[in-house]
Design a protein with these regions (language model features):
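Catalytic cores of nucleotide-sugar-dependent glycosyltransferases that transfer UDP/GDP/TDP-activated
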Residues: 1-213
């Protein structure tokens, strides 16, 4: 398949601003390339993919970042800045996707989900967060009712944040183990880095810490 990926509109890949989406995108690209798929990635200027993903074609877009929904109130309205990075990435992605099989959206935002109902090009979404916004939650419910196979989540507990999702498609976060060094020791602290949210599995991390003493 020819797949076009839309990156997060919050910082360029490699900046760290996009949080776990950066790792997820690179891991996903690695897996898809290994399966023989053709991959285009639409991302903010200055973005970099892992060297192992050099077969993917990277397209740069400029514009103003979106405000993260993690930093807004649950009932905040949708805002799109002038010279929107998200809108520019979607415009670029949709143009390339005219000759592709599917457009895969990695951003948790209103506009790409809304466009699923309004363009002929298939748009799929990996929802990376729990329910952070009333307006996005309601839109996902509306689009999911028509296109249930166009949404995937990272875990069952995360999908449970959306009560209308009965049989979620789960795409776990894969890790390229070559990028990590195994520490064969039980001494020293176990560090936890992550947002306090159900899908992060903080309870599991605490359980492991307790088991290790």
């Amino acid at each position: 398949m020819h797949i076009v990926l839309i990156s997060t509109p919050i910082g360029f890949l490699g900046s760290g601003k996009g949080g776990g989406v950066e790792l997820t995108l690179n891991s996903l690209v690695s897996g898809l390339l290994s399966l023989g798929h053709s991959i285009d990635v639409i991302a903010p200027r200055n973005s970099k993919l892992y060297k192992s993903n050099e077969k993917a074609k990277l397209h740069f877009v400029e514009g103003e970042d979106q405000i993260s929904w993690q930093h807004q109130n649950y009932n905040s309205p949708v805002t799109i800045p002038d010279n929107s990075l998200l809108a520019a990435m979607l415009e670029k992605g949709l143009d390339i996707a005219k000759k592709a099989d599917v457009l895969l959206n990695m951003s948790y935002d209103w506009l790409p989900i809304w466009m699923t109902l309004n363009v002929e090009i298939p748009i799929a979404h990996i929802i990376s967060m729990g329910s952070e916004s009333s307006v996005i939650n309601n839109l996902i419910s509306k689009v999911y009712a028509k296109y249930p196979d166009n949404f995937a989540f990272h875990s069952k507990i995360q999908a449970d944040d959306y009560p209308f999702i009965k049989k979620p498609i789960i795409i776990g976060n894969g890790f390229k183990l070559d990028n990590y060094t195994f520490q064969d020791t039980v001494k020293g602290p176990l560090a936890w880095v992550g947002r306090v949210a159900p899908e992060k599995g903080l309870e599991d991390a605490v359980f492991v810490a307790n088991e290790l003493g």
